[in-house]
Design a protein with these regions (language model features):
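Short amphipathic alpha-helical segments
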Residues: 16, 20-21, 156-157
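Catalytic NTP-binding/metal-coordinating core of nucleotidyl cyclase/transferase enzymes
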Residues: 23-102, 109
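Catalytic beta-strand-to-alpha-helix segment of the class III nucleotidyl cyclase homology domain
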Residues: 92-212
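Residues flanking N-terminal targeting/processing segments that define the start of mature chains
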Residues: 8-15
Length: 215
């Protein structure tokens, strides 16, 4: 059975996981300009980072950033670029299913770190946002390496601030790209149109999760 986005009768919600009813999302048709390629973009924001003391930062790097780096290392053949600054983690993938897998792994990894291990008097959380669309590679002279830019990167960045802590919000394009992958173990629950950050507009968004029996 394939992985599709479906309309749930009665409650107006949609999810991914079976061929039922009318498929709302058709195969995405994305026009590429010269020099562009399709990619999946993830932004993550670590909740509680602003409460850390200077003396907490080495432990944060060891217990939060290092495990996330290892997750990305495990998928390095599909990771086009990655970066972090403060509470933010950014990664671009050439495969939307790998991006979804990494998003859920990051969610699980950060969410499961015990405050006793960190030595903090509070738990850290994470919110993640994903988008799929045309991105443009450029060489960044400041970083000294290739990175990716474009309006689609900005769109993903504007979704992350409105994501509920502990959740992964993705765009319709991300959900549709996943829907084309046969047997992909993911589900996307339709959230409705959501106001994005910095007056970027309203977008139909989905909550990404692992598929369960009955989806």
């Amino acid at each position: 059975m394939g992985f599709v986005v479906i309309q749930q009768p009665g409650d107006g919600r949609q999810n991914c996981g079976g061929i039922v009813g009318q498929i709302r999302l058709a195969k995405p048709t994305i026009s590429l300009n010269v020099g562009e390629q399709n990619g999946a973009v993830l932004f993550a924001d670590v909740q509680g980072y602003g409460r850390l003391r200077e003396s907490d930062l080495p432990n944060y790097a060891a217990e939060i950033l290092r495990p996330v780096a290892r997750l990305l290392d495990d998928h390095e053949t599909h990771v086009l670029t990655r970066n972090s600054w403060g509470d933010a983690i950014f990664a671009v993938f050439d495969d939307v299913a790998v991006a979804a897998e990494c998003a859920m792994a990051i969610q699980q990894t950060i969410g499961s770190v015990n405050r006793d291990v960190l030595g903090y008097p509070f738990d850290l959380g994470v919110r993640l946002a994903g988008h799929y669309g045309p991105i443009r590679p450029i060489f960044d002279p400041i970083q000294g390496r290739q990175t990716y830019v474009g309006t689609q990167i900005v769109q993903a960045a504007r979704i992350e601030p409105v994501t509920e802590p502990g959740m992964i919000y993705v765009t319709e394009a991300f959900a549709a790209a996943l829907a084309l992958i046969r047997g992909a173990p993911f589900a996307c629950d339709y959230l409705g149109e959501v106001d994005t950050a910095k007056s970027h507009g309203r977008l139909p968004l989905y909550a990404l999760r692992a598929a369960i029996a009955g989806d």
